[in-house]
Amino acid sequence: MKQVVYVASPDSQQIHVWQLGSTGELTLLQTVEVPGQVQPMTINPNQRHLYVGVRPDFGIVSYNIADDGTLTAAGMAPLPGSPTHIGTDLQGRFLFSASYSFNCVSISPIDEHGVVQTPIQQLNDLPAPHSANIDPTNQILLVPCLKEDKVRLFDLSAEGKLTPHAQSDVTVAAGAGPRHMAFHPNQQVAYCVNELNSSVDVYQISNNGQEYKIIQTLDAMPADFTDTCWAADIHITPNGRHLYISDRTASLLGIFSVSEDGREIALVGHHQTEAQPRGFNIDHNGQFLISSGQKSDHIEVYRIDQISGELTTLKRYPVGKGPMWVSILAPRA
């Protein structure tokens, strides 16, 4: 089966389902009407369920993924706050939801049918948590809290309970505003994009995954950029050679090369993209990048140069209104 791309458009309450061809072309498979403004999405590690966060009736809609990638609704569960970012643990047993405006993170069990259930825990008084990211050991949840300039760390128990990690947090530069994260495939390095100054922090992971330390910070914007920074998303290629971020003010993608050990990044350049790129993603083969324009109502596909990481525009496609999230299903054997 070919890869399948899901694009969430909250303003029209739709998910567009596309098949991704081997040369980067997209073929529309399905348009799903969602019961609410669909925002964050995540795919179960077993690749058979898609989860989407909706508002104004805060909740998670679970979808079954058919063999061709199309979706069928399987259930809905409530959330304590408006979902800003969602993710699962690596075994697909629990779903985490970060709520920026409600200052909380919740954890919900996923049943044996792949359907998200009512939350079993809620962590409150987190200053504007913008994402919830499980680490490569499946034991630590990292939560960038934008308004306190810290990334909080929590231990995840086998029963799905979160408690503060021994290293409770990592402090970033004042006013940076940590937002989204990505992990290097070697599992020894993590990256966090900072919304308010459009920089990237590189984290060294040590002590068997137990300790995090910032070892590099790099500006992602052009040297002559003088407007307000407004970074959004971050992703790394599967081979760990190139890292990308999006900035919504400039409507561009920042391109970084990554050292072999992942510990050092270098700014390669920029590529203009769709207006206000809230979300983008990279296919599982590392060949294509797909960016969504929250203000353009389009997505655009780019080919990734395997040596330089630079992008070549292939084609843009109309989607729903206000697209802001892109998830990509891995090809099934």
Curated annotation (Swiss-Prot):
It comes from the Bacteria. This is 6-phosphogluconolactonase. Catalyzes the hydrolysis of 6-phosphogluconolactone to 6-phosphogluconate. Belongs to the cycloisomerase 2 family. The keyword Cytoplasm does not apply. The keyword Glycosyltransferase does not apply. InterPro entries: 6-phosphogluconolactonase_YbhE, Cycloisomerase_2, Lactonase_7-beta_prop, N2O_reductase_N, WD40/YVTN_repeat-like_dom_sf. Transmembrane segments: none annotated.
